[in-house]
Amino acid sequence: TEVIKIDFDIGSRAEVLAADNRLSWGYWLKHHCRCLWGNDLSTRFDRFKPSRDIAIAVNGDFASVLTRYADLIEQAVTPTQSLRLQREASRKLIRSTQVLRSEQDLMWPQTLEEHVELFVQHFPCMRMQACFFLSQARSPDAEPKEFTAHLRSFLLWMASEVV
């Protein structure tokens, strides 16, 4: 197995193992993390069936996080900074579309393309918007004002659908 990316999600052992965090930390450890050293806490959890509850536990912060990204992009000092933030925001937005998943969806999307494909199956009218963010996640090139307008519009739509 090749390790292609290392991220750090900071949390205490008690927080990770708390029953209230089973759908967030438990899911994340079981399905997305590989222990490189120390106690492998993922062994404490059974595999999780795909569900909207887990999507909300993991991405329920999408409105505040994406609003913060929009603000940071508008305040960016350099084009490099803005493009980096646009890429990050696009990736978060695409993954956050899981909060709209159907309980009948039987798979966890792994790639950004799979996230978009699943999303568009349920919301075909949003294909163009989803494809815009997929292109920005891969190779950001939109002007900051254009990007934040798209981001804020998609965010409002998503928030109205989550109810």
Positions of predicted regions on the chain:
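Conserved nucleotidyltransferase catalytic core and NTase-mimicking acidic/glycine-rich helix/loop elements
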Residues: 41, 46-163
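Conserved catalytic core of two-metal-ion nucleotidyltransferases
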Residues: 1-37, 64-66, 72
